[in-house]
UniProtKB/Swiss-Prot annotation:
Alphabetic keyword roster: Cytoplasm, Nucleus, Repeat
Name listed for the protein in its UniProt record: Integrator complex subunit 4
Lineage: Eukaryota, Metazoa, Chordata, Craniata, Vertebrata
Keyword check for Nucleus: yes
One GO BP: snRNA processing
Length: 969
């Protein structure tokens, strides 16, 4: 029995239990809620015990942003308090807030239109009404596509046009101008009726008693025109009447309306008042606008002068009247005293008074019936150019330029007036006059008296004025050889008085000679001081005046093959010297006495194709096909290719950017290849540390990549990716050098983490370029990223070293054109041996004049560096106003650098050069991308990033003697 029980105890029983699946408890969702803006505003307004408190709460609320989903609730709260509020100022602020809220991005105000319109019904305050209408205008501008809302707002505006307040009427007219229908054939009849009457409704307020309403009506009509509605010709007479309004705002708006109608109906015929004649509407409007040049308000005069320049359809007869100097009095020219005396004497009339014929009957004229064309257009530009306000004179000069460019006869007639403006007392007017004459120089030829007046401006102390005049003379035609001689004499005087104008004067004489070769031909013996029988002394080639004369003659000789026969022997020698030193000023001439073998750019038969471009491409292809970059022969081939590319850049200016960019890229590869040489890495750590080849290579590669990125313009996304790929290789090499020369692994943790971030950034930033980088360093690195993340620093260094040696040469593809940023310092000149003396401790101003080529955003990137003999470095950031932009891709820097130092025992040289500042960060790299794929991943870039800043020298240093004198005690 015991055995049986024991067996029962140890017996295992099996039992199948079917359990119902338990329901999973619903996951709790965390919902973040923001405090309700409407509730907070409601509580604040309820706490207000006075209108001043309520106004204060509203002002505080206006400073806080409101989300689009909260706007409607806030509007309801504001409207609720609006109806409860009795104070006008609080209701006015609420109405203003409604307008601000309706402009919230992402909010559609169609749900609050009815509520805002209802607030107008019981409002008695004119100020609040005007503000509510302004709010409706803001709502309507956001609902322009919804015709029903727009037309309802127009009806509201029409309803309140009869208000006694000018502010309400102004807002109604503004609403009509911005929301009135401009469709030619509306779909609905109701809309058609309103659209047909909107011009009439606005036009009825042209005669409103308040000038502010009249101005608003005209501006509303102009707003309709800007929105595409063709204005009716019938309102031209109304616009003409408004030109004589007592208020300048009305006259100013009426002038613009008259001009608009003259452009719409230029060929329409309108009658002349009190006459049976008819003229074109544009001619009539031109005369009326000319009449406004004599308006009492200088604002109206400026606007009238500006509009005259755009009325190009006017008849030549009326256009020429604007330059008529005859003084008009009741349609009669004012005769001189001699002419009046002669007429009186020939008439035979007499009187017993003091004056002969003073009691003779005169024709009575109605001054109100004077022809506006004759009295308006006559002398309009004369009045404008002689106006007391310089703004009017500038506007008149600009309009003269526009009209003269469209009419060659008018350009000839206005020449005397423009030349007279060169003597204006305001520098801005003189400068604008010079620019204007340069623009119309193709249509004019200067006489000797006009040229004399023009050349007098060379005495101006303003550098901008003088250089603008030099540019004018570059494209000016003169009539006689005396004019050429006069221009040369005055330019040489300018050169003597202002030596800093040397480059500008030489350039001016270059174009002056090339435009007038036959006139210069007759002056050659006199200019070169040659004699048919006697030898004359050889002039000094260092004399800038003599160089200026030669530049004039050599450029004229290019178009005059008989001129070289008048040259003396030393002139040919001087030509070869100038052709080599100033090749941009002296052209290539086929002179019989000159050997051409060593002179660049000689006139020869042009090959059918430019071989330089082909040679550049073949050189790059030859390098790309290299397999073993570490061999000695490969490195020598890279060096030869770099040398050839540099030579191409020196000989071919068009290919200089592409050749220099390619040479820099190959130089980086050469440095990287030499730095990875196995013999260097097999050295012991102390010897490796002593041999600084690898460290210098890393530093130089990083510098070259920054130059490639910031000194060259025209780069595409692929070139920028190649630059960053080379920089990534340099940083990997830097990590290897640090691991080789540092004891322990702790300093490497931070560098390894930073390097992995760089790899991640490269992948996200240049993801579209990765397919073009097969078998490159970054391509292999991305495959090894999971392994690198889990590796120790020393293991990661070994992987990087192996990957660097195994990666292939990344092919460099070039865009159509690459330009390299360059600069040339004109002043200070390096040849001066006279030191700049000043008292120690004080400052002296050094004039800096430089030309910049292909520099992007020079106002923020170009700096001036001054290096003193004791090693002190001063970096000056010029003002934005110091930069000028004479042409596309070209800038001019004219500034002053203030120097100061302690006393020296003898004069020493300081170095002045230009620097190009750069700042490279991840966000800026992405923003510079032109490809959309660059900008797609900007959100994933970490906000905390280190920015690399530096400067790149991009001009030759100029040495200037400086001598600080000790202060007298």
């Amino acid at each position: 029995m015991a055995a049986h029980l024991k067996k029962r105890v140890y017996e295992e029983f099996t039992r199948v239990v079917q359990q119902q699946p338990l329901e999973e408890p619903s996951a709790k969702k965390l919902r973040l809620t923001k405090p309700s803006k409407s509730a907070a505003l409601h509580i604040d307004l309820c706490k207000a015990t006075s209108p001043a408190d309520a106004l204060q709460y509203l002002l505080q609320f206006a400073r806080k942003p409101v989300e689009a989903e909260s706007v409607e609730g806030v509007v309801r709260i504001l409207l609720e308090h609006y109806y409860k509020e009795n104070d006008t100022s609080v209701r006015l602020k609420i109405a203003s807030l409604l307008g601000l809220l309706s402009k919230t991005a992402g909010f559609c105000p169609d749900s609050i239109v009815d509520d805002v319109i209802n607030t107008l019904q019981n409002e008695k305050s004119h100020q609040v009404l005007a503000q509510l209408l302004d709010t409706l205008l803001e709502i309507g501008l956001k609902l322009l596509d919804i015709v029903s809302h727009r037309m309802r707002l127009v009806d509201v505006a029409c309803k309140h046009l009869s208000d006694t307040s000018h502010g309400v009427r102004n807002k109604c007219l503004q609403l009509l101008g911005c929301l009135g229908s401009v469709e030619a054939s509306p779909a609905k009849e109701v809309e058609n009726a309103v659209a047909k009457d909107v011009q009439k409704i606005i036009g009825d307020y042209f005669i409103d008693q308040d000038p502010r309403v009249r101005t608003a009506a005209i501006k509303a009509m102009l707003q309709l025109h800007e929105r595409g509605l063709k204005l009716q010709q019938a309102m031209y007479n109304q616009a003409c009447k408004l030109l004589t309004d007592d208020y300048e705002q009305v006259r100013s708006a009426a002038v613009e309306l008259s001009w608009v109608l003259s452009q719409l109906y230029s060929e329409s015929i309108v009658p002349i008042p009190s006459s049976n004649e008819e003229i074109r509407l544009v001619d009539d409007a031109f005369g009326k606008v000319c009449h406004m040049v004599s308006d009492g308000s200088w604002v109206v005069r400026v606007q009238a002068c500006k509009l005259l320049g755009s009325m190009l359809q006017v008849s030549p007869h009326f256009l020429e009247q604007t330059l008529d100097k005859k003084l008009m009095s009741d349609l009669r020219r004012k005769r001189t005293a001699h002419e009046r005396a002669k007429e009186l004497y020939s008439s035979g009339e007499f009187s017993s008074g003091r004056k002969w014929g003073d009691d003779a009957p005169k024709e009575e004229l109605d001054t109100g019936a004077v022809n506006l064309i004759d009295s308006g257009a006559c002398g309009a530009f004369v009045h404008g150019l002689e106006d007391e306000m310089y703004e009017v004179r500038i506007a008149a000069v600009e309009s003269l330029c526009l009209l003269a460019r469209s009419s060659a006869p008018f350009a000839e007639k206005c020449l005397d007036f423009l030349v007279d403006m060169f003597n204006d007392e305001i520098e801005e007017v003189r400068l604008q006059s010079i620019h204007t004459m340069r623009k119309i120089s193709d249509n004019i030829t200067l006489r000797e008296d006009q040229l004399d007046t023009v050349l007098a401006v060379l005495e101006d102390k303003s550098r901008d004025i003088r250089e603008a005049l030099h540019e004018l003379l570059c494209c000016t035609n003169v009539s006689t050889k005396e004019c050429i001689q006069l221009a040369l004499v005055e330019l040489l005087k300018n050169l003597s008085k202002y030596p800093t104008d040397r480059e500008s004067i030489w350039k001016c004489l270059k174009f002056l000679g090339s435009r007038h070769p036959t006139l210069v031909l007759s002056l050659v013996p006199e200019l070169l001081s040659t004699h048919p029988f006697f030898d004359t002394p050889e002039p000094d080639m260092d004399d800038p005046a003599y160089i200026a004369v030669l530049v004039l003659i050599f450029n004229a000789a290019k178009c005059c093959p008989t001129m070289p026969a008048l040259f003396s022997d030393h002139t040919f020698r001087h030509y070869t010297y100038l052709r080599d030193s100033l090749s941009h000023l002296v052209p290539a001439l086929n002179l019989p006495s000159v050997r051409w073998s060593w002179i660049p750019d000689v006139i020869t038969e042009a090959p059918p194709e430019d071989p330089s471009q082909q040679f550049l491409q073949l050189s790059l292809e030859r390098v790309h096909n290299l397999q073993h970059l570490g061999s000695q022969g490969t490195q020598e081939l890279l060096e030869f290719t770099i040398r050839d590319l540099q030579r191409i850049g020196e000989l071919q200016s068009d290919l200089a950017g592409m050749a220099d960019f390619s040479a820099t890229y190959l130089r980086c590869h050469l440095l990287l290849t030499k730095a990875l040489n196995e013999k260097l890495w097999n050295l012991a750590a102390p010897l490796f540390l002593k041999n600084s080849l690898t460290t210098n290579a890393v530093k130089q590669i990083l510098e070259e990549t920054y130059k490639m990125e910031f000194m060259y313009s025209g780069l595409e996304t692929r070139q920028v990716a190649i630059i960053h790929h080379m920089r990534l290789q340099a940083k990997a090499l830097q990590l290897l050098v640090t691991a080789r020369t540092t004891k322990g692994a702790e300093p490497l943790f931070g560098m390894c983490e930073e390097f992995l971030q760089e790899v991640d950034f490269f992948q996200r930033c240049f993801i579209s370029e990765l397919p073009h980088m097969q078998d490159s360093f970054v391509d292999k690195l991305l495959d090894l990223v999971p392994r690198l993340v889990n590796s120790k620093p020393l293991e990661m260094v070994k992987i990087l070293q192996t990957t660097l040696r195994q990666c292939t040469f990344l092919r460099l593809t070039l865009p159509e054109q690459i330009h390299r940023a360059s600069s040339h310092i004109i002043e200070p000149a390096e040849e001066s041996d006279n030191p700049i003396r000043f008292t120690s401790g004080l400052v002296v101003a050094l004039d800096v004049d430089a030309t910049l080529e292909h520099v992007q955003e020079p106002q923020s990137t170009v700096k001036v560096q001054v290096v003193y003999p004791d090693g002190q470095v001063q970096i000056i950031h010029p003002k934005p106003a110091d930069f000028r932009n004479p042409g596309p891709g070209r800038h001019r820097l004219i500034t002053q650098v203030y120097l100061s130092h302690t006393a020296w025992t003898e004069p020493c040289q300081i170095e002045v050069r230009l620097l190009l500042a750069y700042s490279s960060s991840r966000s800026k790299v992405m923003s510079r991308a032109s490809n959309s794929t660059w900008g797609e991943s900007t959100e994933t870039v970490p906000s905390t990033e280190s920015s690399t800043e530096g400067t790149i020298p991009f001009s030759k240093p100029v040495k200037v003697f400086l001598m600080p004198k000790p202060a007298r005690r």
